[in-house]
Design a protein with these regions (language model features):
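A generic structured-segment signal
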Residues: 45, 62-66, 74
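Compositionally biased, low-complexity intrinsically disordered regions
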Residues: 30, 71-74, 80
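Cationic, low-complexity basic patches in intrinsically disordered or flexible, solvent-exposed regions
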Residues: 54, 64-67, 100
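Compositionally biased, intrinsically disordered low-complexity segments enriched
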Residues: 40-41, 47
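Active-site and adjacent substrate-binding regions of carbohydrate-active enzymes
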Residues: 2-6, 12, 16-21, 25, ...
């Protein structure tokens, strides 16, 4: 490994102490005396984030709060632009060379690839993936058709939860490289036209974070103590569900140093921050400033619903949380223009839609749809998908659903009924070892029995239903998993690049790898790897590259409306994606057997269905039902073309 540059070494050396300076200091731990007005503090934080550079014209300021701490965040984080409005909405002049291009709602047309830096590619041979390795593989991702990268946390951390236990928000974990390595990666990604977003872990920190270490030693009721949520009794917020019931019995844990209980919605080593404390909100604004000034394109807001707690509620999705997200959005847009906020909120669709009304997040993961895609495949009928699509609440025109099949977590089954959950467990995780909490810890290929037809059908739906598709690293080649690894590490094994040493992931001795490579058939890295699939024209990888290329030809997939098409076969799903004069008919057979279907396409009478992949044209649509036959788990994407070039208005 090369020696880090002086500036990078200084950043790493500052390490965990950096954000101890996030809040203003006072002569003691008690009270709110000595807290600078938020307007002044915001400017100071912005200047620090830019290494002493002045804020750009159009920078927003924050209205000062009422003295004394908590209260409604909407009264604390009130955005008002400065008088210099000429540059409003534009990035600051001192931004890094990797500065994003002006916003164009790019996320609606994006193909997002989720990558774990730790397990993607090792660039220095120490057994752990890093930013040098990720940079080296950007050409591969570009050729796949990826247009945006979502990075899992790469901050300094004890790694008790694979980086979601953050110990310093404004540095790079030494195992993954330096801040300079990150900047070079970001510049190279932008040079290829790829956007980059990363996880912003708002809800909690590690117990090793300096904030928590100071809080547990501070006087009860002091401003430092109140960085977290404390109680003398574990009886507060009774009835609030435990998210990880396999690992935690309660949301409260006793701290012998503080001699009090602290609140945590996830693991006991991840105490929740207290967002009723304006100092916490200021500190997180500093984190946002730091990364956006480097040119980051946005954030996935991790565990978003749980920022606030209120007695007598489920402590999820509270009005205070939505108020904070609105102010965060306004703060970012006033300073940096449009950067994307992607909500991770495992909630019902009606609750999720509240984040997508145009003034909070740009995108949200569609947690209600994902398990019903698998339920439809298990039942071999379209009803579970249709139920979600018909009941889907309206979202703002500029907002978008993020669609996914798998990710780094378990396949969560919280958004289905207990009966449906049991049905899904029996279908996809008959082995109890494959289950964790209320979900399944398997990758996509093992979930679908490594059945190529089912995999292709799942991807065809992912890339054609309304929303932006998100691919989990390794799923493009049908990687397997390792359920002998604990918890969710089962689906976070090293990327399989070749059939050589360590699957081509690292040149280190196998004993030094951050995680073992998959060696069990049929997913052994010698059989399932990028190198072999690139050489095979009919591989899953090359098939997916073609699918992505076809999707990119039709903006209707990313921006168009959805029209459900009636048919006479419950095992077939049919819909039209439409944008202006562009209309794409999607027909999918959810059964393992050949199916015929008569579709009501009278509204498109006279149109010629043209295969989006090969260009073959079918007979023209008439007013009577249109008959199609689909192979097992087969699908069609037809471009509906009228000879004179006009498409009729939908009914």
């Amino acid at each position: 490994m090369q020696a880090p540059r002086r500036e990078d070494a200084r950043r790493q050396g500052e390490g965990l102490a950096t954000l101890s300076e996030a809040a203003p200091r006072s002569s003691g731990d008690g009270g709110a005396d000595g807290i600078a007005p938020l307007a002044q503090e915001a400017d100071r934080l912005a200047q620090e984030g830019g290494r002493g550079q002045p804020a750009a014209p159009g920078t927003a300021t924050l209205e000062p709060p009422e003295r004394g701490g908590g209260g409604d965040p909407s009264a604390v984080l009130s955005i008002r632009p400065r008088q210099e409005v000429a540059g409003r909405g534009r990035p600051s002049a001192d931004a890094a060379a990797g500065q994003p291009v002006p916003p164009t709602l790019w996320y609606k047309d994006a193909v997002i690839y989720e990558v774990h830096v730790r397990t993607f590619f090792d660039g220095n041979g120490d057994g752990t993936g890093d930013f040098r390795g990720l940079t080296a593989k950007l050409d591969y991702l570009q050729e796949l058709g990826v247009t945006a990268l979502w990075l899992l946390p790469f901050y300094p951390s004890p790694l008790a939860d694979d980086g979601y236990d953050v110990a310093d928000y404004t540095a790079v974990h030494p195992a993954y490289g330096t801040l300079g390595d990150f900047k070079r990666f970001l510049a190279e990604a932008h040079r290829r036209g790829m956007r980059v977003i990363t996880d912003l872990v708002l809800n909690h920190t590690s117990t090793q974070h300096p904030w928590f270490q100071r809080a547990r030693r501070a006087r009860p009721g002091s401003r430092w103590r109140d960085f977290y949520v404390w109680s003398d009794s574990p009886d507060r917020y009774r009835g609030v569900r435990v998210i990880f019931p396999d690992y935690e019995a309660d949301n409260w844990t006793w701290d012998p140093v503080a001699r009090a209980y602290y609140w945590h919605r996830f693991y006991a080593h991840q105490p929740d921050l207290n967002y009723d404390n304006p100092m916490v909100r200021r500190a997180m604004l500093k984190v946002v400033d730091f990364w956006l000034r480097l040119g980051l394109d946005g954030f996935r807001l991790d565990a978003l619903p749980y920022l606030f707690e209120r007695e007598g509620t489920a402590c999820a999705g509270l009005p205070e949380t939505h108020a904070f997200v609105r102010e965060l959005r306004a703060y970012i847009e006033a300073r940096y223009g449009e950067r994307v906020l992607l909500a991770e909120a495992n909630e019902p669709a009606a609750e999720l839609a509240r984040y997508l009304q145009g003034d909070e997040c740009h995108m949200a993961f569609h947690f209600p749809l994902m398990p019903r895609l698998f339920l439809a495949l298990a039942r071999e009928e379209a009803a579970p998908i249709l139920q979600v699509l018909r009941d889907e609440p309206a979202i703002a025109p500029a907002c978008q659903w993020a669609l996914f099949l798998r990710n780094h977590d378990e396949l969560t089954l919280e958004m289905v009924s207990p009966q449906e959950r049991e049905e899904l467990w029996q279908a996809y995780a008959a082995d109890p070892q494959a289950r964790v909490n209320l979900g399944i810890r398997r990758r996509l290929a093992p979930l679908l029995g490594n059945d190529r037809r089912r995999l292709e059908l799942a991807y065809a739906l992912l890339f054609s239903l309304p929303g932006t598709p998100v691919i989990y690293y390794g799923d493009e080649i049908g990687m397997g998993d390792n359920i002998y690894l604990p918890d969710r590490h089962a689906v976070r094994t090293p990327m399989q690049w070749s059939g050589g040493r360590n699957a081509g992931f690292s040149t280190a001795n196998p004993q030094r790898l951050c995680a073992p490579v998959v060696v069990d058939p049929p997913y052994h890295y010698e059989a399932v790897n990028v190198e072999a699939q690139l050489a095979s024209p009919d591989s899953l990888l090359n098939w997916l590259r073609r699918l992505i290329a076809v999707r990119k030809r039709f903006p209707a997939f990313g921006r168009g409306d959805l029209e459900l098409i009636a048919g006479d076969n419950r095992r077939v799903l049919a819909f039209v994606r439409r944008l202006g004069d562009q209309a794409i008919l999607v027909v999918a057979n959810l059964s393992r057997f050949v199916q015929g279907v008569r579709l009501d396409l009278a509204a498109y009478a006279g149109c010629l269905p043209e295969d989006a992949f090969g260009g073959a044209t079918l007979p023209p649509i008439e007013r009577r039902p249109y008959f199609l036959t689909l192979g097992p788990h087969g699908f069609y994407w037809f471009v509906l073309k009228r000879p004179e070039g006009e498409i009729p208005e939908p009914r």
